[in-house]
């Protein structure tokens, strides 16, 4: 999937590099290429996370390893790490270095050596430390790269240059960004699973149909977007509900205004108000109304910075592009930014703008600092969100399996399992007859993959899958003799319920496996001429409960497969599950709080939790004065 400013190109859309129609959104082509642009145009291309290495390998083979290399980034010396590294050079023990870092002002740690260390600390700040690999940058050279730079082999087997992206641009090399993301993996695998499970083929590029689909629009408007690319976080779902977003244009804007700068500057709140009250606000200046009418006078995209700087403040397009890069965190010169800042205010003063208006416009520009999207980038993300939403709306079980298998979502696996259960799936523990390495769906039954079982070795999984291809397992003895899995691994499989095909309970299976393997000296396979039948013993009746299963699952999966409500000693009455008509009343929470996100402040903490209900889920954000109690 092509994204970023390259999606401004109608040629890219025509070649199926992107699914973004630039004419539909009146995208600003000059953001991609213009005569005044100070850097080469950049085209970001995303692949599924599990395909990027294959694509990179193809590029090296296609153009030759002498002509291709990954770009480097410079990791620099920073802060306390300088003291630590220089202290090692001077032979100081770790304990003394720690004291020097934590208590630099203490006189007992001040001597000629420490004075030299602190002097070097100031001098080395920002110096290169070591090379790292750029997130996805690749350069291709017509002549062998070793004519221009040394190459260094990385553990993945691909060489890197001794340049970063800025040096490569200065020399004249164009960078190709081969990036990856897991959202594409969700979509790609969903399409495959849907075809396999229910026989429906989907053309995922029919984005125009997805944008106008009433079911998808309702899903978007309600914020039911768990698992969907870029729109599943609590903040994003909350924004969608506030905007009552149900169309492409609104989602494109929402994808950009959710970024930290706009939210912290208060402009996100202002945008929501203006979105719902288009006749109840005033534009800060007539020029701003002309430039930003589509976004109600709020700068939302990087293009807005360019347009406002050029048309409002009279900054030429070359400097406007430098300003845009600076706001994106890509500027290399503080002096350049200071010069453009002075130019902005001087030009505004010459044009007779009130100082308050000039400062407010600049404040909005500064909100883009470090993290901002071009409109084309937001549009690319919105298209992928619509693709995810379509799959979740009409094929929720298969979609959630794909989300679970690709990992890397906003929530833990447990949350996605609960979401699948709420959409009608039967969640089943791993099974040696039905489960694969990854999670699998058969009809409405979802069998968790062996990959989720802690301490289960890959060679054990491979042995199970290999033998199962030959024929099903007859019983416990047949399973043990064919897979050759040792006792500790068998105990894990029993506790997670993977050997339930035997018809025996977990405790009985544990007895059986210890009788078969517990005290047996392992005989080399080549020396065992005849298969000796094991002796059978009568065992007492052994029982286990749902609570036993839940505890085993907590230990091996990290979460129980049943609903926590099923484990209650006294079952809650059905009507008590509903919250209707119970506003302003206290409620008890039945949920273990596992993930706590605390942002420490002087006066409070933020407690962010995910709460599960029987047929729903709730994100909770609390301001609490219990900084030291959690």
Residue ranges and their predicted role:
Residues 1-630:
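Noncatalytic, beta-rich nucleic-acid-contacting surfaces in large DNA/RNA-processing enzymes
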């Amino acid at each position: 999937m092509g994204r970023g400013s390259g999606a401004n190109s109608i040629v890219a859309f025509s070649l199926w590099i992107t699914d973004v129609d630039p004419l539909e959104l009146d995208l600003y082509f000059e953001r991609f290429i213009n005569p005044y642009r100070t850097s080469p145009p950049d085209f970001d291309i995303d692949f599924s996370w599990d395909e990027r290495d294959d694509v990179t390998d193809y590029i090296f083979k296609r153009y030759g390893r002498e002509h291709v290399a990954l770009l480097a980034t410079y990791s620099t010396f920073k802060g306390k790490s300088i003291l630590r590294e220089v202290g090692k050079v001077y032979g100081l023990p770790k304990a003394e270095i720690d004291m020097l870092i934590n208590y630099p002002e203490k006189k007992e740690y001040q001597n000629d050596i420490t004075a030299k260390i602190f002097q070097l600390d100031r001098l080395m700040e920002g110096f290169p430390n070591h090379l790292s690999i750029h997130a996805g940058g690749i350069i291709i050279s017509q002549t062998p790269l070793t004519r221009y730079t040394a190459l260094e082999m990385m553990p993945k087997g691909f060489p890197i240059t001794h340049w970063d992206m800025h040096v490569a641009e200065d020399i004249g090399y164009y960078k190709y960004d081969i990036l990856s993301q897991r959202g594409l993996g969700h979509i790609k695998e969903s399409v495959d699973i849907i075809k396999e499970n229910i026989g429906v083929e989907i053309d995922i590029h029919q984005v125009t149909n997805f944008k106008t689909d009433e079911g998808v629009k309702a899903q978007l408007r309600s914020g039911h977007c768990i698992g969907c690319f870029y729109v599943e976080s609590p903040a994003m779902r909350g924004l969608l509900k506030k905007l009552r977003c149900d169309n492409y244009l609104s989602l494109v804007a929402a994808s950009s205004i959710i970024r930290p700068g706009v939210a912290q500057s208060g402009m996100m709140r202002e945008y929501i108000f203006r979105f719902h009250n288009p006749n109840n606000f005033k534009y800060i200046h007539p020029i701003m109304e002309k430039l930003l009418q589509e976004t109600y006078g709020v700068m939302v995209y990087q293009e807005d910075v360019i347009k406002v700087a050029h048309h409002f403040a009279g900054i030429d397009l070359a400097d406007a592009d430098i300003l845009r890069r600076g706001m994106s965190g890509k500027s290399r010169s503080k002096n350049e930014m200071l010069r453009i800042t002075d130019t902005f205010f001087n030009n505004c003063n010459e044009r007779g703008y009130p100082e308050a208006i000039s400062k407010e416009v600049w404040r909005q520009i500064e909100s883009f600092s470090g993290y901002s999207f071009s409109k084309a980038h937001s549009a690319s993300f919105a298209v992928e969100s619509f693709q995810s939403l379509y799959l979740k709306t009409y094929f929720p079980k298969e979609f959630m399996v794909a989300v679970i298998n690709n990992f890397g979502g906003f929530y833990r696996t447990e949350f996605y399992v609960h979401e699948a259960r709420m959409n009608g799936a039967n969640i089943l523990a791993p099974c040696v007859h039905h489960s694969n390495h990854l999670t699998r769906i058969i009809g409405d039954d979802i069998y968790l993959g062996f990959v989720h079982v802690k301490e289960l070795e890959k060679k054990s999984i491979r042995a199970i899958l290999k033998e199962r291809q030959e024929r099903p397992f007859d019983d416990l003895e047949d399973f043990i003799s064919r897979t050759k899995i040792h006792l500790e691994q068998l105990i894990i499989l029993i506790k997670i319920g993977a050997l339930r095909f035997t018809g025996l309970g977990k405790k009985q299976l544990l007895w059986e496996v210890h009788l078969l393997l517990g005290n047996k000296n392992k005989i080399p396979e080549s020396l065992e001429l005849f298969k000796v039948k094991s002796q059978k013993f009568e065992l007492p009746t052994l029982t286990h409960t749902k609570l036993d299963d839940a505890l085993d699952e907590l230990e091996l999966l990290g979460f129980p497969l049943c609903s926590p409500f099923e484990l209650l000693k006294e079952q809650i009455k059905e009507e008590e599950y509903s919250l209707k008509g119970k506003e302003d009343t206290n409620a008890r929470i039945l949920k273990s709080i596992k993930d706590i996100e605390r942002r420490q402040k002087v006066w409070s903490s933020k407690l962010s939790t995910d709460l599960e209900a029987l047929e729903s889920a709730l994100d909770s954000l609390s301001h609490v004065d219990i900084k030291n109690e959690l």
